[in-house]
Amino acid sequence: MVLITVLANLLILQLSYAQKSSELVIGGDECNINEHRFLVALYDVWSGDFLCGGTLINKEYVLTAAHCETRNMYIYLGMHNKNVQFDDEQRRYPKKKYFFRCSNNFTRWDKDIMLIRLNRPVRNSEHIAPLSLPSSPPSVGSVCRVMGWGTITSPNETLPDVPRCANINLLNYTVCRGVFPRLPARSRTLCAGVLQGGIDTCKRDSGGPLICNGQLQGVVFWGPKPCAQPRKPALYTKVFNHLDWIQSIIAGNTTVTCPP
């Protein structure tokens, strides 16, 4: 009975979201130069390698994925084209990194989130501004925006100079669990993608934003390989479920009470 329900959900969602395919560009398009002022790039200090994306949420904090952690990193803000520098680009280093350690009612799938306090505040500018945290959870069926400098081919890796942007659909979590049975029955992650395939986040997009209704609703977490397969959406850490933790740390309370 459960399998029938999941298959029915997949069919209904595939048919309903097919109607929205005209809103999407296969594989994503180059982001508009003014639409990603909050998008940051994480680099390894020693190798200079691009690691992950992240999101500026205020002048002093960046939100990204915990699996993007490396001992020595720097954060680049205001970048569009890796080979063309803007006058207002800024570089910062982590002053402190915070990881979500709560265990009550949270599985390992729910904890891929890292809050970075920058070594000094960022100045808002033409190409730098924070993105709002969510005021409410996103609704299934929402069309959301993803972006990043991650690979644009899979399984072989091709990294672009300019970030790519695409629209994907927020799906019911049961869709992801139907495709990936090892997922827990309940999760505080978001399931999102395009069931027809061809559009997806991929390697090195990790840590970047899932934006729904102009708010940061998700952090790029995990997806199948190769990327962008039909009927195989990806998982995003649900920011709304970590909101109290984030806001408490920003307010100076680093011994945060875990949410229920």
Swiss-Prot record:
Tell me where the signal peptide lies: 1-18
Membrane-spanning intervals of the chain = none
* Residues of this chain annotated as glycosylated in UniProt: N105, N156, N172, N253
Its annotated compartments are: Secreted
InterPro entries listed in its UniProt record: Peptidase_S1_PA, Peptidase_S1_PA_chymotrypsin, Peptidase_S1A, Trypsin_dom, TRYPSIN_HIS
Q: Cystine bridges: which residues? A: C31-C165, C52-C68, C102-C258, C144-C212, C176-C191, C202-C227
Q: Tell me the PANTHER family matching this sequence.
A: KALLIKREIN-1 (PTHR24271:SF47), KALLIKREIN-RELATED (PTHR24271)
The name under which this protein is listed is: Thrombin-like enzyme 1
To which species is this protein native?
Trimeresurus albolabris
